[in-house]
Structure formats: structure tokens, C-alpha cells
């Protein structure tokens, strides 16, 4: 559905777009893909290899915006009212006397995230098989709904269950029938499942970059595709408008500064879908500008603000209402930059005189929470190595690059696959990228990026002196990599 134009045709210089990409790189952001469009005309599209145009990106909480529109479509069909009490739609799942606050909670409250509940850590409670049942029975309500905004991801999952109950279809199948089949998008997309088989609608849509951008464009275009009004325009305007204030800090942080609609963030003069780790789709209807980006910046303080600051400085401030004269040389330079993008590796020196001393030495670990009992390093060449270690699962090897990523399978098994919160088995492993740098002569820092249906990362800092080693591993990942977080003291054998 998209066409491609030069930045100059879009009203911005190719050099400004190149500076935008370069500044994000300089800021150390771990991005996977980026797209900029004026309406349905793309003027910048890039992928950090191994990601490409066909890659399915985990959107995390951007998924909520899809579920929110699905709820609105069901309301338009007359299958629900936004002012319905949520408890009236799930009598079969309620096994307690309904608390007063919960009895007053409506679908609209949930769309706006003004619920009566706190967001539960359902991952940790293995008995939380049916998240809707868990939400309605196990979480104590503590405030009147409709008064205070607080992020409630679990409530979004309940709304997903409602979509599937009332439509009789999977969330994505329903949206395909209503929207995406007509647009020719989301043909390869899918949604992971919760433990009981419901679509994981608050977190787990996987789709291409153009897919998610097309959804942003549809809402920016008032729900109209070609001559067909796929979503009533009034409904779109209601969904993307500021329904409630959501500034919890008083500092006006990027997405808490302006407001919240129906599972859609409102800020500046536009709206956004926002997902963990740097998944963003931002639309500015007044300027006909669309921006989508994916990545894994979990654990990077201020990543969203950095991305938006770069967008403001190099795109929004430079964008003109009329086309600019073509600049073939600058455009060629931009295309060269975009085609050369590689998944970021950890920066730092790739050589140390200590490397030969460390090579092959076995370290015996003191008792630690990660159950790593021993480790060693093997350096196969000047720019590659292997982290060898033994933990509760047995002996493992993790190849890594120096000054580059090495791609492979992360050796820990038992993490979730199609069903969130359930093990994928002992023969299922996530794709990963690993790199290392010598930050000091006797300090090696290893970074591992999980680049699969689930995104996560960890840093491991290995400091050596006088036959001893101190190791600090710090992970950022939702419900996995728990075995890679803590401290180790070790001695050379």
C-alpha cells in the first residue's frame, strides 16, 4: 500500500534524514528498523542487519493499540457498549462475590487505563493460567475506577479475551477481516498466546515494520483506505484523542506528558503506539508524517526520549510543507548509509595483552544465585571468542565477537515459545547476537542480545586480577534470563 519517494519530495533534505540515523547510532541506541513516511509515501526505510523488510518484529505493548481499535469496532457493530460493566461480560469466569470497585469498572475505564486494580505480575504466578479469570478473581481492587490513570497491562489482556469472545475469532483474524485484508497488510503477522491459548493481546503481536506503519497510517487517515471507510472516522478521532491525563511524575516525560486515549498514547500534536524496549509508531496528522521504529533498548534509561529528541531535531524541525529540489548526491549517501546498517555491537577496544593469559584458564566459582560453577574463555581468532561455562543445566558455550556480533543460538533452554509463561522445551533456543570489548586491560565486557520472538539483553562484566575474578551480570528481559543476573567470585584453577 506504500509507495517510495525521496526525502526531498517529502519536503526534507536527505542529509537531515542521514543525520537523524547517525545521531541515533551515536547515542548508542540498539535499533532494528526505522521508517519515515509522508502519508503513504515512504521517504526513509532502513534495517539493521540481520533484520530486513520481511522480519517479524515483536511489538510488545504496541499490540494494545490494535486491541483497543478492535474493541471500538465491536462497539460500532453493537456487540458491546463502552459503558458496559466488564463483569457482565464474563459471569462464567467470576468465582467470588464481586468487589464494589470492580463491579463499577467499565470497558471505557479499561480502554483509558483508569481501572480499580494494580497490574499483577502474572508471569511469576504459575497458577495464573487464564489471565482473565485471574484478573477478575485474584487481584484485590483498591480504588474507584474512572478517577486515576495507572498503567494496567492485565486489563488490556482482559479486553483481548472480550474481543475473541464476542467476535468468535482470534484478535488478529478479526482485525484482518475488518481492516487488513482490504489493505493487503499483515499477511505474515501472528500473535503469541497466553497460557490458556488466548491471543496475547497486551504484548505479543509480531509483524513487519510496514505492517505496523500501515496501521498508524490508517488511523492518521481517519480510518479510510482508498474509497472505503474501514473504521468510522468519528470512532478514530475518539480513540486517538486525549481522553485522560496520564502524567504520573510531574516531569512531563515523553509519553506521560499529554494524555491517553483508547489504548493509544496522545502527545504533542499526534498519537503513538508504544511498546517496551523502543517499539514506537508515532503519527502527526497535521503534518501528514508517520514514524515507526523497532529495537531492543530495554535497560537504556531515556531511550524513548532520545529517539523523540532526534526525531524533533532532525525531522520535525526540518520538514517543509513543499518539496525541495532533488539532491542526487545526498540521496545516494543516505541510501548507502541505510544499506550498511548492522545490529549494534558493544563498543570498545578489541585487543588486550591479557587475552593470551586468559585464554583457556578455568575459573572455579563460589556459590552464587546463578548456579554458575565454573567458566573459561577460549579465543579462536583475533576477533572471535567463546564463553564456556557450567550452570544448573550443564556445560554451555556462547560464541562472541570482538568488534562485531556473532550470531547463533543462546544456549539456555526452557524459555517460552508460542505460549507466554510456558516452557518451549529442552530443544528450543532463542536466536542471539553476542559481542565483547576490553574496557580495561583486565576487564572484558560481554553483551548478549536475544533477537527472537522475545527480546532481551544482558551485560556480563569480567574483572581479573592476581588469579581471581569478579563477575557482574545484569539482564533486562521480561520473564526470562533470570539465570543471568547476579555476582560471582571465582579463582583460577
Regions found by a protein language model. Give the residues of each.
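Structured C-terminal helix/loop/strand segments within mature extracytoplasmic catalytic/sensor domains
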Residues: 275-345
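Active-site helix/loop module of the DD-peptidase/beta-lactamase fold
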Residues: 77-115, 166-203, 207
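Active-site-proximal loop and beta-strand segments within enzyme catalytic domains
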Residues: 2-6, 10-11, 15-25, 52-63, ...
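A short, well-structured edge-of-sheet supersecondary motif
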Residues: 16-52, 82, 288
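Active-site-proximal binding-pocket segments
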Residues: 182-240
